[in-house]
Design a protein with these regions (language model features):
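Conserved catalytic cores of very large enzyme subunits
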Residues: 1-255
Length: 255
């Protein structure tokens, strides 16, 4: 896996196009049985009402099922984008080809194999919002299942109301274990995600290169747009606010 910065040989290797998945959005869908509170639409599969869950494992399973559903959808979008690039004709990759000496010499665009190292033609998949997802899972595990200080009903209602009227619970969630502070409680959850999520996302093979896509775990400036698509989260984050930036940054103010 790579973070926000991918390393490539200058003017010799080209990384193919890719798409991103907002992991935190998938987790939000899992907490709402596949229903999106923001658009008021059933976007994902019905993975169970979390209010009826009796273990944290059920929460994780619901999230993984959402991911398994949306990964093929993302790949279909990728193929549609590629089809558009192909129908655009030879001009579609000309600007990029002008940056590669090998492409100029061979008269081929990077996607046609003009770059010196064609391995770079593989697609990439971006896994965004991993830190917020892990932090939110840790809050649920600690407060709902381990310590039983709140019910899932109370926590989900607090998120739906953007913590209004739930100020004490909001502070409890903000003070729950946060990734990046050397706390095994949440780091172990992130470790599981960083293993399981790539395994699910890389089940797909690029039909053009015949290779598994390269996985990026990051956000870059995308954390602002990602946050606008989200409601409040169990980690204490407010609705519409940015998610954690970069690849592995701690929640702002929590390191």
């Amino acid at each position: 896996a790579s973070g926000c910065l991918g390393y490539h040989l200058d003017c010799m290797e080209h990384l193919g196009g890719g798409h991103n998945i907002n992991q935190t959005k998938l987790f939000e869908l899992a907490l709402n049985n596949g229903f999106d509170p923001r658009t008021q639409k059933q976007l994902g599969p019905k993975t169970g009402d979390p209010r009826t869950f009796t273990s944290f494992d059920q929460v994780m399973d619901a999230y993984y099922k959402q991911l398994e559903y949306f990964v093929p959808v993302m790949h279909k979008v990728k193929m549609l984008s590629l089809a558009t690039e192909i129908t655009d004709g030879p001009m579609s990759g000309l600007r990029c080809a002008m940056q590669y000496e090998d492409c100029i010499r061979e008269g081929l665009t990077p996607k046609e194999g003009g770059a010196r190292y064609p391995e770079g033609r593989t697609s990439w998949l971006g896994s965004r919002g991993m830190v917020d997802t892990a932090d939110s899972m840790a809050a649920i595990k600690k407060l709902v299942f381990d310590e039983k200080k709140v019910t899932m009903e109370q926590l989900l209602d607090a998120c739906a109301k953007n913590w209004e009227g739930y100020e004490d619970l909001h502070q409890m969630c903000l003070n729950s274990p946060k990734y990046g502070n050397d706390e095994d409680y949440v780091d172990d959850i992130y470790d599981e995600l960083s293993t399981k999520v790539p395994e699910i996302m890389q089940r797909w093979i690029d039909p053009i290169t015949g290779k598994k896509p390269m996985l990026f775990i990051g956000a870059a400036a995308g954390h602002i747009a990602l946050g606008k698509a989200l409601g409040a989260l169990p980690n204490g984050r407010l609705a519409g606010s940015p998610t954690c930036d970069a690849a592995c940054s701690v929640m702002p103010g929590m390191d």
